[in-house]
Amino acid sequence: MEEYEAQLLVVEQALENAADEAQRQDLLALKNNLQELLALTRDTGDEAHTDELPQQGDDLDDELQRLKSELSDLEAVGSSQTALDEERQLADLRTKYTAMVGEKCSAPHEHSWGTCYHNALICGVDDEVVMNSEGVLDARLRVLFTNPTHREMLPCSYYLEGECRFDETKCRFSHGALVPGSSIRKYNPPDFHKLSRSRPVFALLPDRLWHRGRVLCVNFVEQVCRVRLDGQDHKERERDFKFEELFPLTTDQDEDDELSSEESNSSMNDDSSDEAESDMDDLEEARRARMVELSLFTFKPTERLGAWEEFTRGIGSKLMEKMGYIHGTGLGSDGRGIVTPVSAQILPQGRSLDACMELREAANGDKDYFSVERKLKRAQRRQRKADEKAYVRESQRVDVFTFLNDSVLGPGESSQQGEQVAKKIKTNELQQHSTKTLNVETVRIADEIRRKQRDMAKVKQSLDRNSGDAQLQKRLQVQMESHKQELATLQAQERSLSKEQQTRKSKNKMFEF
């Protein structure tokens, strides 16, 4: 049939190129014959095809059935093998997860704003099998969060004791969150050395929830930190927390510091010795700056380290300063040592340690019961009381100065009253004092009289200068009267002393021969 079609094609090409009319007639007749022959050949082929079609259809059905049976056999074998592999994989996972029960980890928790990781404790393995994000079978772990920030994360205390009457869906507290095992991360322990001012932290409040806040100051000696809590619902926003009640949060600065430390380590390995020394200098400066900052935000102790050196030359502090110590920071290379000096204690002589402990327990466990400083302060208090008693005794003694002040000087006395008081002075009382004491008192009173006269002259000048101001004139008149009274008293006292001195001189002349 293909040969006939090829011949027909050749005849058609020759017919197009033929120029003679007789030749064209012959080619047309040949073309018609070939077309009829092709038509007959096609009809014969269709009849033969219809006769063989049922037999070929049966062969195809059989072949299709065999193919389906082979595919089903292969699928059955593959599914059984896959099931065995999955069961083996799940068994290995359960064995691995069962060994992790009781360990600490970091587990995800779905919040309204997204997923956040919190420290948790693995308490069991769930029986249900889940498919993780990569399409691999995985088991779920039941975890209890150690730092719950929301009520749905707070573990049920009755569930932990096995006495909760509600199931997981009805209880208001958590019976353990179910998380895929593949999402578990490494436990993030709290690093209290990172505590510094403005550091974000989680703080434990009485409601057993951890609330967010920021550090105000840190006391590494007492391990106490003052935190300002976020939010307006806290009556006392600033509170003191112990270190075990805090969880420092990681910031971007910490990640940058870690990256910079890694880069500095790699650069120190690659660079020359000169660059390594410069890096070490930078690290030393950063360390000193860190220690200074640490000293600024540390609770100030009651006593300064080295306060006893005010009685010495302070050679100890000078040596420590040369060795790199920064005043105000703790001892040690990182400045996190003690700040308060260690108090010396003296135990009773000839007593055993058990007897000393009994004495301390009898004093309600006072740690400073045998402290040397406490004994010194007690001795100082006794000495202070003795000094006060001596002062009272000395103040009760009457000397010439006290006698003159009490007897002669007095507020509101006029010149005439001063004269009367001076006349009433007993001669025997003045005779009790020595001539030297009387001379000193005479000089002192003379100075007081001259000073008082100068004050009166100044007040008189003020009166003359401010004659038009009535109120000021009144105040100046009062001052003038007061100065006159004091001057009269001093003059009376001076006359009394002069009289006593003159009497003594007269007696001395009487005894001279």
From Swiss-Prot:
Localization per record: Nucleus
GO-annotated molecular function: DNA-binding transcription repressor activity, RNA polymerase II-specific; RNA polymerase II cis-regulatory region sequence-specific DNA binding; zinc ion binding
Residues in the signal sequence: none
Zinc finger (C3H1-type): 155-178
Organism: Drosophila yakuba
Positions with biased composition (Acidic residues): 252-261, 271-283
Region (Disordered): 252-283, 455-513
Compositionally biased residues, Polar residues: 468-480
GO cellular-component term (any): nucleus
Role played: Transcription repressor.
Gene3D superfamilies: 2.30.30.1190
Protein name: Zinc finger CCCH-type with G patch domain-containing protein
Entry-linked PROSITE patterns: G_PATCH, ZF_C3H1
Assigned keywords, A-Z: DNA-binding, Metal-binding, Nucleus, Repressor, Transcription, Transcription regulation, Zinc, Zinc-finger
Ranges for domain G-patch: 312-358
Database matches in InterPro entries: G_patch_dom (IPR000467), Znf_CCCH (IPR000571)
Compositionally biased intervals (Basic and acidic residues): 455-467, 496-513
Lineage: Eukaryota, Metazoa, Ecdysozoa, Arthropoda, Hexapoda
